[in-house]
Amino acid sequence: MKNVGFIGWRGMVGSVLMQRMVEERDFDAIRPVFFSTSQLGQAAPSFGGTTGTLQDAFDLEALKALDIIVTCQGGDYTNEIYPKLRESGWQGYWIDAASSLRMKDDAIIILDPVNQDVITDGLNNGIRTFVGGNCTVSLMLMSLGGLFANDLVDWVSVA
């Protein structure tokens, strides 16, 4: 079972993610560890039946013990922690809702199912950083994904 850290799980994006993961029973397949930037030491949520205390989201040693980090904490957190963690030699998977890493060569924007092939290729080729896309663009591409996949779009114009 993978150790998966969650940072930013209380906000709008994170709370929707938690709800969806509970509904899909995703917590049954992982060991979740919940982190906080402001409430460390308090009781962690009990998603999936886990208990414990909130860990310090700035503790690099605690973060390095994780196989996967899922963060919805925002760009400032990502900009501070991500480079330090990678420079320390951490080889885990970083999954981020923030825009900070979108243009990095070693990151893939998650837009499943539109780019499932790109995600799969990235995983097979050692990519370990996955980021969310711009909400408006993502929704548009997801709604048009089937049309693109079936070569039914000649051109797109944006005003």
Where in this protein do the model-derived segments appear?
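N-terminal Rossmann-like NAD(P) cofactor-binding subdomain of oxidoreductases
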Residues: 1-159
